[in-house]
From Swiss-Prot:
Belongs to the NrdR family. Pfam families: ATP-cone, Zn_ribbon_NrdR. This is Transcriptional repressor NrdR. Its cofactor is Zn(2+). HAMAP family: NrdR (MF_00440). It comes from the Bacteria. Binds 1 zinc ion. The keyword Thylakoid does not apply. The keyword Zinc-finger applies. GO terms for biological process: negative regulation of DNA-templated transcription. It comes from Idiomarina loihiensis (strain ATCC BAA-735 / DSM 15497 / L2-TR). One of its GO terms (molecular function) is DNA binding.
């Protein structure tokens, strides 16, 4: 790997450890030429399937859309960003585990709901109200009743 300080290719790894629940490797490196030290992070680059939207159009999986949807549902709720990131990683792992090249947006939505139900029931109902297009208060009540079952 090139040294970011002097540009030499001659660097060595002096320490490696797993981070982010084993999803990444943090490496401390040292340049053999200028002796500067720096940190790199290594993660597997995995291709996510395309998402088939309800109107039939297709688009690449967008992690930012997933994160924003979770942030909206979890807004002002006592849930840490770390817990939310874990949910994002679980959802992405479930999507990858299908082995499919394309998945439906409904499948993604159901994974989000499944994870929100485990994290925060209020956020789950918030997300469900948008995802399922609740029309009136009765539908909220029915969803809350299903939570208690």
């Amino acid at each position: 790997m090139h040294c970011p300080f002097c540009g030499t290719q001659d660097t060595k790894v002096i320490d490696s450890r797993l981070v982010a629940d084993g999803a990444s490797v943090r490496r401390r490196r040292e340049c053999n030429h200028c002796k500067e030290r720096f940190t790199t992070f290594e993660t597997a680059e995995l291709v996510m399937p395309r998402v088939i939207k309800t109107d039939g159009s297709r688009e690449p999986f967008n992690e930012d859309k997933l994160r924003n949807g979770l942030l909206r549902a979890l807004e002002k709720r006592p849930v840490s960003l770390e817990l939310m990131e874990q949910a994002i990683n679980k959802i992405k792992s479930s999507i990858r585990a299908t082995g499919e090249r394309e998945i439906s947006s409904n499948f993604v939505g159901s994974l989000v709901m499944e994870n929100l139900k485990q994290i925060d029931k209020v956020a789950y109902v918030r997300f469900a109200s948008v995802y399922r297009s609740f029309e009136d208060i009765r539908e909220f009540g029915e969803e809350i009743a299903r939570l208690n079952d």
